[in-house]
């Protein structure tokens, strides 16, 4: 193993699309780790979906041997991280395993919201940060402006920033030299009791759970008996290895090393991310500080379109949960949709990706209900409940107070679009908290908003109102009491639980009317009348009807008495009544999305 003073552990942090994964590819090229034959874009993004969308979802760790200009052999452990706000927990786990970070900033775009959010995460871990300006080969790059933004907005010295083009490979060797010269070597005592931090884990069908970890103190060897400090479970290490970039076995790790271990661990819950691995014979006195447990904040119901696929959906969800600590699910039933699962996600991108993976990797047709956030209810008895499904809201007479989650959001926007952003945030019940200038024409606006207002289309609207120039980052701060009501949708007098939603009373009438109108358009006409109603409690606030399709029963009557025609029409009317009583309305998937798209009306 390499000497501790010659190890450098670092991660690459950046806003989404600023070129992290491309820079990681070039570093692998320059160090000769990836052969010409194996080359592909986004080498570290293993998931097909990651490469297709051009985003990083799971953090990846790779060991890079590097011979520096001073002639010494170094080991660089690169931990690639995602940039999207939904996956910021993946970033914080990766940073806990490093001593330093490369901050990649797009020289054409400048400092953006998630750049700042990730920098503050890195500073929380006392990291040394090296600014890297990417895309300097583009004619639209403005190096001087971006350096000024880094100095004013973040407070880093940009004079030392490395200017690169990850696409062409220009100056990537300078980045490697900067890592060796400016980032500190890991500290830690190899003779102390073992303390190793788990920063990622996933399930392998042959080896059980594979644990990615960073040794802080002590030494770990193949065959050692280890213990997880959070769960107390004991295992024997069957395999130790590193990704370089493909898996290679090693015999032992000492303080400062990053690698993976297999120990026939059956369940992902037994090797939790943030837990500490120690020896069972000589355990460490205290565990390492881990990460706070991530809680899903957006919930939606997932139902198989074919009810016979219910067990298959359960298997698929369990399989996805093995590799995704932040995803949760539990069984639920709906009168309208049958048996399905209530799933919890970190945000909307996370939800989209899970849905897409279920449909693509497991070939299951899904119906998804409208996403909702977690509300807090204070009952008359003084009991606190958290409500993930609007249909589970208690009777209004039993509710003392209804609380919704609020987020603090930072929006970075060019000067000319500030008015549009204010207007959007006011519409979404936002409270302005702060506004400051990052540069002459770039503003950071801070708002506090109800999470429910931003969960569906806020980001899309923000992008279109600012021509794609705005970027945002948010964190959940607290629960606040609001004037909220449950809006029920009724089809022919029967409430459809999957369409129920919790809305602010001021918006309930408009929202109810808009959903009813949209449902009227999406539900196909039947042989009987279909009435769509929106209700708050027992009060109907909106009503739409789809007229029945009717056969011209009097077509065969040529002339003759009017009573003959009337008799046929009365007979048809009776039949329609019976049909309406007996008939079921088939709701298409679009009907469930109707509840989401009401703001466009």
UniProtKB/Swiss-Prot annotation:
Bilayer topology annotation: Peripheral membrane protein
Subcellular location: Cell inner membrane
InterPro entries: EF-4, EFG_III/V, EFG_V-like, EFTu-like_2, G_TR_CS, LepA_C_sf, LepA_CTD, LepA_IV
Keyword set, alphabetical order: Cell inner membrane, Cell membrane, GTP-binding, Hydrolase, Membrane, Nucleotide-binding, Protein biosynthesis
Amino acids binding GTP: 17-22, 134-137
Role played: Required for accurate and efficient protein synthesis under certain stress conditions. May act as a fidelity factor of the translation reaction, by catalyzing a one-codon backward translocation of tRNAs on improperly translocated ribosomes. Back-translocation proceeds from a post-translocation (POST) complex to a pre-translocation (PRE) complex, thus giving elongation factor G a second chance to translocate the tRNAs correctly. Binds to ribosomes in a GTP-dependent manner.
Protein name stated in the entry: Elongation factor 4
Source organism per UniProt: Oleidesulfovibrio alaskensis (strain ATCC BAA-1058 / DSM 17464 / G20)
């Amino acid at each position: 193993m390499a000497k501790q003073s010659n190890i450098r552990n670092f991660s690459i942090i950046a806003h989404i699309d600023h070129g992290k994964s491309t820079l990681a590819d070039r570093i692998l090229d320059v160090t000769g780790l990836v052969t010409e034959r194996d080359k592909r874009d986004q080498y570290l993004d293993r998931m097909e979906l990651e490469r297709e969308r051009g985003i990083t979802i799971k953090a990846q760790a790779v060991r890079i041997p590097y011979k520096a200009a001073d002639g010494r052999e170094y080991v660089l452990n690169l931990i690639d991280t995602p940039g999207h706000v939904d996956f910021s927990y993946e970033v914080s786990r990766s940073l806990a395993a490093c001593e330093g970070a490369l901050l990649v900033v797009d020289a054409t775009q400048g400092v953006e919201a998630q750049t700042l959010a990730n920098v503050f995460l890195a500073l929380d871990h006392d990291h040394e940060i090296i600014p890297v300006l990417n895309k300097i080969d583009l004619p639209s790059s403005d190096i001087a402006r971006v350096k000024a933004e880094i100095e004013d907005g973040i407070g880093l010295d940009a004079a030392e920033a490395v200017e690169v083009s990850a696409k062409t490979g220009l100056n990537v060797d300078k980045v490697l030299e900067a890592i060796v010269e400016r980032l500190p070597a890991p500290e830690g005592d190899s003779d102390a009791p073992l303390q190793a931090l788990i920063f990622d884990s996933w399930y392998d069908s042959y080896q059980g759970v594979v644990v990615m970890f960073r040794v802080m103190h002590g030494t770990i060897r193949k065959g050692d008996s280890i213990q997880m400090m959070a769960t107390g479970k004991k295992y024997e290490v069957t395999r130790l290895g590193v990704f370089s970039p493909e898996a290679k076995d090693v015999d032992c790790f000492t303080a400062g090393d990053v690698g993976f271990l297999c120990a026939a661990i059956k369940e992902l819950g037994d090797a939790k991310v943030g837990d500490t691995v120690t020896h069972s014979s000589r355990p460490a006195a205290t565990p390492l500080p881990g990460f706070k447990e991530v809680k899903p904040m957006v919930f939606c119901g997932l139902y198989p379109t074919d009810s016979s696929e219910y067990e298959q959906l359960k298997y698929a969800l369990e399989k996805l949960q093995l590799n995704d600590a932040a995803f949760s699910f539990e069984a639920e039933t709906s009168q309208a949709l049958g048996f399905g699962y209530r799933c919890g996600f970190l945000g909307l991108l996370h939800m989209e990706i899970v849905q897409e993976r279920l449909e693509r990797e497991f070939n299951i047709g899904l119906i998804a209900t409208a996403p909702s956030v977690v509300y807090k209810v204070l009952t008359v008895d003084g009991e606190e409940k958290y409500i993930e499904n609007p249909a589970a809201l208690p009777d209004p007479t039993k509710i003392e107070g209804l609380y919704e989650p609020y987020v603090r959001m930072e929006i970075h926007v060019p000067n000319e679009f500030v008015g549009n952003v204010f207007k959007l945030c006011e519409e979404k019940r936002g409270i302005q908290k702060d506004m400051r200038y990052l540069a002459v024409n770039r503003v950071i606006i801070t708002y506090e908003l109800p999470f429910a207002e931003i969960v569906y289309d806020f980001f899309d609207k923000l992008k279109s109102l600012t021509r794609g120039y705005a970027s945002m980052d948010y964190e959940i701060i607290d629960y606040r009491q609001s004037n909220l009501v449950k809006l029920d949708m009724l089809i022919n007098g029967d409430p459809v639980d999957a369409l129920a939603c919790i809305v602010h009373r001021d918006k309930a009438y408009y929202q109810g009317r808009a959903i009813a109108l949209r449902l009227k358009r999406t539900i196909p006409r039947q042989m009987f009348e279909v009435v769509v109603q929106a209700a708050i409690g027992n009060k109907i606030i909106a009503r739409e009807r789809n007229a029945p399709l009717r056969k011209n029963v009097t077509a065969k009557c040529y002339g003759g008495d009017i009573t003959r025609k009337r008799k046929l029409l009365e007979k048809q009317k009776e039949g329609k009544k019976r049909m309406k009583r007996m008939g079921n309305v088939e709701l298409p998937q679009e009907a469930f999305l109707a509840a989401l798209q009401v703001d466009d009306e």
